[in-house]
């Protein structure tokens, strides 16, 4: 019946499979015919069909594989079942073969080890057959157990369960060597597995935990209660107490000694102040050494322990005495002798009354465990006799009577009129001498010499205030406010370190006839103040908080990580315009990788530009300079009020602005010694030059610093026209500018000759020599005077600063000659006190040549348009990433790392105020030769400027021209046998000397020297 059902199932499965296949083929043919009708194509154009139809659909394939798998496993199961069933039915009483017979053909372990190389295939075959036989036997036994059939006991079966000879072979197995840590870990793992298995078995068997038995507090009924008076208990207690008496006394001593020390302080010796101060330190140090050492009385008193055994014995004696309740009074001396060593001295002997037996605080009780000992009773009262009153009392000193202060009679100061009425009448002829030496433009000195100061001081005395009078000439300050006075000499020029003599001296000096010979300038102390400038301006919204800096630091790290550049922001500095973040690249990250991401990082952070500082001097990190969302306005008054500018003693101090942290930046032009400023239009170049000029005007008087200004644009520097610091009017014509530079070269040569004669190395040494001679009342004559018999005296030489606003226009006008003059001044003019400030908006190589750059090491670069311009100015990149509006890079001489500075803003209103303030103190003293150029009409600076050496054949050429009466280049060339260029220069020199005229329209020249003079 079973076989019939199985066959029917197989047939149905096959029929279903064929039905699905036929159905799929029918559907496929229907789709093909529909496709043919739609496309209208021929049968030949259809794709080829394999086996009449395409592949099965997915559902058919899945069904086919499922049926195939089911049929396979069903067939395997039926075959196994039939085999087992037929085997048991055919041989129900088949005896189990002996195990020894089955193992006879199986090779042992020793056989395998001995003959491992021979007969490998035979051994494998025998092992396979033996394994099949054992499997069959085991299966028979298992089948018998399942069928509940008893198997008769057979010794062969028992022998089969015993270990074989190969298993108890003397051959040692090969063990794996492991470490102790691995073995411990394996044992722990095995223990955990065993515990887990035990708990799992208990859970599967539904084992319940044994309930805990609650112990009753009351004894069971019928038991005998043993009290404290039981003889056995008392005997046991006595033996235990005697055995532990020594240990207990020592432990009790440790517990009661602090109480004894606290309640009976008079029982100890006197404690020194030093020991009392050291006691807390000893107690703190003793906490880690045990309770006994920390609580000992000698440590409490700040004393060192020298003999530990003696102290321990003393403790034991004290503990024994404390347990004797019959003693009511204990001698203090005896107790102290037991507590401290014999070497200690005892100060004071008084008896301390101990409490009685009923009030004994050390009561003996028996504990619940049968151990007794003294226990401290907190409820007991303690009575200690008060110490005796001291023999001497501290007596306060008697009160000091108050002594009334004696009245001091101070004479009132004399009235102002008495001070100002002390006048001095100069000797005869003094006024004429002074008038000849003082310039006519010095109105202040004229007023003083004419006696105008007496009228003003009298008006001040009548009014009663020093600042009440004003000059009738319209000056801002009065005489007394500008110059000051004292009780010994009243002179408006008293504190003025200048070259001109003071107009009034004290009476003593007048009697002695001590008149300073050095001239003093009246305007030396008329320096402008910061009141003329706009006050500082601070915008609190432009400051960045710590949270914003931290957020930007995290953003920088994340954005650089996106470009596979790992860095860490270590610090940040927030300034008025930018914020610098110092980053430390990770190990293996090059600095160029951060530099190449400059524009990408700026775009990612949403800022206009980022400047990457590859090297920060003194640090091991790089720098990222990001612009602030809002920038601060830096006023010029903020820099002038700073200590850096105020404490600078140089007359050529330049205020540049603030650095990235907001600190003022000032420099000394005398140490520069020349300055090159370059930047595009609108970068703040002209404003920076104005700030530098105002810095020198605020620091130096006209007798200290003189200026020559060249302004091709006629707008920037023309505002300074008329200030007393100018040597010449502001030059706006470039042809005259070359003359000014030529005069500077001649002045430089003149000063070098004077310094060589004086034996000094710079201008400061020369001026010091002049000042020392004037202090001695001597005068130094000019060694190069045109009148050697009566030479004019040498005077103090001021610094000369040449400011050129647009250097490129000057280079285009004069060209090569201007470059030579600038190079000569840059090379040699430093020691002569002549300094250059060159500014240009076209930083190209034809303007800033290599010769100029080599001699001007100090440079300032404002914002430029390209990296090439930045390299032209600074010899490195970075200026193209500046922000404009005064943002600059300042390169100091001798350094390769420029400093970023934010320039101070000088408005036109501030410049006008300072100029008007300076104009009121006098007209400038111009030098006419600066712009005239000696009256020559040719290109200034090109004719004879600098040609101090005359051609040795010049006289012969003049003689030839005068004899022949022909001024031709070819005639001079033939007569002197020289080249054309040299002959042409000689003719040009004759024209400059006025010997021949300029060439006419036909090229002929007329000899201007008469024949008689020839």
Swiss-Prot record:
SUPFAM superfamilies: P-loop containing nucleoside triphosphate hydrolases, Winged helix' DNA-binding domain. Keywords: ATP-binding, Cell cycle, Cell division, Cell inner membrane, Cell membrane, Chromosome partition, DNA-binding, Membrane, Nucleotide-binding, Transmembrane, Transmembrane helix. It is a single-pass membrane protein. Residues 89-142, 281-318, 497-525 are annotated as: Disordered. The chain crosses the membrane at residues 1-21. GO terms for molecular function: ATP binding; DNA binding; DNA translocase activity. It comes from the Bacteria. Residues 121-140 have a biased composition (Acidic residues). Its main location: membrane. Residues 662-871 form the FtsK domain. GO terms for cellular component: plasma membrane. Pfam families: FtsK_alpha (PF17854), FtsK_gamma (PF09397), FtsK_SpoIIIE (PF01580). Consists of an N-terminal domain, which is sufficient for the localization to the septal ring and is required for cell division, followed by a linker domain, and a C-terminal domain, which forms the translocation motor involved in chromosome segregation. The C-terminal domain can be further subdivided into alpha, beta and gamma subdomains. The alpha and beta subdomains multimerise to produce a hexameric ring, contain the nucleotide binding motif and form the DNA pump. Belongs to the FtsK/SpoIIIE/SftA family. Essential cell division protein that coordinates cell division and chromosome segregation. The N-terminus is involved in assembly of the cell-division machinery. The C-terminus functions as a DNA motor that moves dsDNA in an ATP-dependent manner towards the dif recombination site, which is located within the replication terminus region. Translocation stops specifically at Xer-dif sites, where FtsK interacts with the Xer recombinase, allowing activation of chromosome unlinking by recombination. FtsK orienting polar sequences (KOPS) guide the direction of DNA translocation. This is DNA translocase FtsK 2.
